[in-house]
Amino acid sequence: WSSDCALPIFAAGVPIDSVAHIEKMVPVRSDLFSPTPDYLLRVQGESMIDIGIFDGDLLAVRKSDHAKHGDIVVARLNGEVTVKRLDRSQKTLRLLAENIDFDPIVITPDAEFFIEGHAVGVIRTAL
């Protein structure tokens, strides 16, 4: 049995690096995910439903400023936080939804684009 760790929950769209934007802290078993996440992000929207990430879910995120092709990432694009699949397969960098109703997002050279972290799991709860 592993001990609990307390993780902050952030709402999508707020600065993830700001303590002022923490919804609340919740205990999470430290062996629930590997690697251990740094925070939970409350998902908003339906862009990732085809891989089982639904509106209101808590996405367990490991902080990282880089990710590899195919990773599910939390990215900041022009000030907006989004959860998408990173596509590095073409000459352009793209963020792909996992819902056919959403178009790919092409990252242009002038865009403010940062990887905030990558998904390590999902919690479906009423927290």
Language-model features: locations:
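Short, surface-exposed secondary-structure edge patches
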Residues: 48-52, 62-66, 110
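Short, Lys/Arg- and Gly-enriched loop/turn segments at beta-strand edges
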Residues: 67-74, 82-83
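Hydrophobic beta-strand signal
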Residues: 60-61, 74
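Short, positionally conserved secondary-structure boundary motifs
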Residues: 3-54, 81, 88, 92, ...
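Structural motif
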Residues: 56-57, 71
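Flexible, small-/acidic-enriched active-site or ligand-binding loops
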Residues: 99-106
